[in-house]
């Protein structure tokens, strides 16, 4: 129901060009790891729309502060999305690593799609310049979450789906 409501909303509000390829062999009874860039909050709705019914329900790791976003914070909590503290220091990193491992143990129980935004944050021109990223349209990747998911569930994943959200106008899978 949650995804259907989001799909209806994005379908009514968005006249984007969708370039979706390589999804014919996917199925809703498997486990998938999705790697995607991250331009805006709309990316999540886009991913839900293009994968709905093709792969299992999408799960992603959220900053703890997002639990306080009206309505959707409660929805994410009720849907058992993992919330990360993302603090500085060894203790905070260990807590996030433990949260990631615990979430992956739950994900093993029923078909799930784990999404990892490898840039770790939304793309902006200022962040791109500050990082001196060698990529034209991407920030430097952070592979910690991806590596942890692979270490915990690697053999269970049927495929790694590489998604590129482009220009906020066209979406390509």
Labelled PLM ranges:
Residues 1-8:
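N-terminal alpha-helical membrane-insertion module
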